[in-house]
């Protein structure tokens, strides 16, 4: 006479539904699943769907109070990964109702929150997400986007040039400002705070903001071009971050920056809204990304983090370089670069794009090529990244034999 039978039951009975037709409003995910030996792929795929939506390990009486069919994630397709033994791509569909509108934080909590520690899996990697139009529309997205940025800066038909001020830690604010001035005066469009420059004892944020702004306006007057310096507003609390953003706006600078993974999506979205309301461009650095995306069997691919950023909001984002690496990586990098910029992306597995994604006019993000690049890489970079990009040379500019300004000139000349 018991109402239901308790006990551990197989996930695939409920959560593996190969006959399911995906809806336009579903969020779709592609997971690379490596099951433990002896666990069938359907069970592993279903376990992922369950654990990241409504499931728990047993039947509970409260299940009877909701409509599982309406709210459960479903594993609707599984395919083996060619060339890998016992590894599969599991496709999972999540009903839209499982997610809070306009919250990238909640989306990631739901999809990747728990399931990665799951015992039945040796490893799990989220390869791609398809964000439905209905969900995209609940996000503001990037504060301005590519076209508005070009209009603000009055720079057209070429990539933008930047450089990170080195040595990244240890300069006083005044010398830091001097380095900024030299680079901008020499012909770069932007200079950048390093991602770990926040507000340390040797240079407090306010002093840095003031000296960099002075350098920026001086270079602007002398060159007749609009210049920018990414003032890093990342801080220990959201309130402190906003205080820095407000101060930047009062100084009248064009752009600030944020480390969106260490700072968190919640802080980032708040900042992006502020930037749109106050006409600031927002440059995004991806510090910590390799912790999440480096392993090919476990974690999340960077294209997922990039999609999350476009929803949360940012006008530039770092996207690696591709120069001098393998050909295959090049296609994949190009895949997520286009994913950031274009309004519509076709499914293309060779470029790592598992789903067709329609961004319905959400503004685009400019990819930033940075990390170990210098003048000689320019032709390759422009070929790969095209015009809508920021090419960021760090040590490769400042370490040039005659100092920053000539090297900045060299970068500008090489570009043209």
From Swiss-Prot:
Additional record remark: The basic functional RuBisCO is composed of a large chain homodimer in a 'head-to-tail' conformation. In form I RuBisCO this homodimer is arranged in a barrel-like tetramer with the small subunits forming a tetrameric 'cap' on each end of the 'barrel'.
Residues involved in substrate binding: 114, 164, 168, 286, 318, 370
Marked site positions, Transition state stabilizer: 325
Residue list for modification N6-carboxylysine: 192
InterPro entries (alphabetical): RuBisCO, RuBisCo_large_chain_AS, RuBisCO_lsu_C, RuBisCO_lsu_C_sf, RuBisCO_lsu_fd_N, RuBisCO_lsu_N_sf
Family affiliation: Belongs to the RuBisCO large chain family. Type I subfamily.
Enzyme class per UniProt: lyase
Cofactor: Mg(2+)
Active site: 166, 285
Cofactor: how and how many bound: Binds 1 Mg(2+) ion per subunit.
Catalytic activity: 2 (2R)-3-phosphoglycerate + 2 H(+) = D-ribulose 1,5-bisphosphate + CO2 + H2O; D-ribulose 1,5-bisphosphate + O2 = 2-phosphoglycolate + (2R)-3-phosphoglycerate + 2 H(+)
Subcellular location: Plastid, Chloroplast
Subunit and interaction comment: Heterohexadecamer of 8 large chains and 8 small chains; disulfide-linked. The disulfide link is formed within the large subunit homodimers.
Gene Ontology CC entries for this record: chloroplast
Primary location class: plastid
Role this protein plays: RuBisCO catalyzes two reactions: the carboxylation of D-ribulose 1,5-bisphosphate, the primary event in carbon dioxide fixation, as well as the oxidative fragmentation of the pentose substrate in the photorespiration process. Both reactions occur simultaneously and in competition at the same active site.
Alphabetical keyword list: Calvin cycle, Carbon dioxide fixation, Chloroplast, Disulfide bond, Lyase, Magnesium, Metal-binding, Methylation, Monooxygenase, Oxidoreductase, Photorespiration, Photosynthesis, Plastid
An individual GO BP term: photorespiration
Top-rank taxon: Eukaryota
The record's account of how the chain is modified after translation: The disulfide bond which can form in the large chain dimeric partners within the hexadecamer appears to be associated with oxidative stress and protein turnover.
Residues binding Mg(2+): 192, 194-195
EC number: 4.1.1.39
Modified residues (N6,N6,N6-trimethyllysine): 5
Full protein name: Ribulose bisphosphate carboxylase large chain
MF terms in GO: magnesium ion binding; monooxygenase activity; ribulose-bisphosphate carboxylase activity
């Amino acid at each position: 006479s018991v109402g239901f039978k308790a006990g551990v039951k197989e996930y695939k009975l409920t959560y593996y539904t190969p006959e399911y037709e995906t809806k336009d409003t579903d969020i779709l995910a592609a997971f690379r699943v490596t099951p433990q030996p002896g666990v069938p792929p359907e069970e592993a795929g279903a376990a992922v769907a369950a654990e990241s939506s409504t499931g728990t390990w047993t039947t509970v009486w409260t299940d009877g109070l909701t409509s599982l069919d309406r709210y459960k994630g479903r594993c609707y397709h599984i395919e083996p990964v060619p060339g890998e033994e016992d590894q599969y791509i599991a496709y999972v569909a999540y009903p839209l109702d499982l997610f809070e509108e306009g919250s990238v934080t909640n989306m990631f909590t739901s999809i990747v929150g728990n399931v990665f520690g799951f015992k039945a899996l040796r490893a799990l990697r989220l390869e791609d997400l398809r964000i439905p139009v209905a969900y995209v529309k609940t996000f503001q997205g990037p504060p301005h986007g590519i076209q508005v940025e070009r209009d603000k800066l009055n720079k057209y038909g070429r990539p933008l040039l930047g450089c990170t001020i080195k040595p990244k830690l240890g300069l006083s604010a005044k010398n830091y400002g001097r380095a900024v001035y030299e680079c901008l005066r020499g012909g770069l469009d932007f200079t950048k705070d390093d991602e770990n420059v926040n507000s340390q004892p040797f240079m407090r944020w306010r002093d840095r903001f003031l000296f960099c702004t002075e350098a920026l306006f001086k270079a602007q007057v002398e060159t007749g071009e609009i210049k920018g310096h990414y003032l890093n507003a990342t801080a220990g609390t959201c309130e402190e971050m906003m205080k820095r953003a407000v101060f930047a706006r009062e100084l009248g600078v064009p752009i600030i920056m944020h480390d969106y993974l260490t700072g968190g999506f919640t802080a980032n979205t708040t900042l992006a809204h502020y930037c749109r309301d106050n006409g600031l461009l927002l440059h995004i650095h991806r510090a910590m990304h390799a912790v999440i995306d480096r392993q090919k069997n476990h974690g999340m691919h960077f294209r997922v983090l990039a999609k999350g950023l476009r929803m949360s909001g940012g006008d530039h984002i770092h996207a690696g370089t591709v120069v001098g690496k393998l050909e295959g990586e090049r296609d994949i990098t190009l895949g997520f670069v286009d994913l950031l910029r274009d309004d519509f992306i076709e499914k293309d597995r060779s470029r790592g794009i598992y789903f067709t994604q329609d961004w319905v006019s959400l503004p685009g993000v400019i990819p930033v090529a940075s990390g170990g690049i210098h003048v000689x890489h320019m032709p390759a970079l422009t070929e790969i990244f095209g015009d809508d990009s920021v090419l960021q040379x760090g040590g490769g500019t400042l370490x040039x034999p005659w100092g920053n300004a000539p090297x900045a000139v060299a970068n500008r000349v090489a570009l043209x």
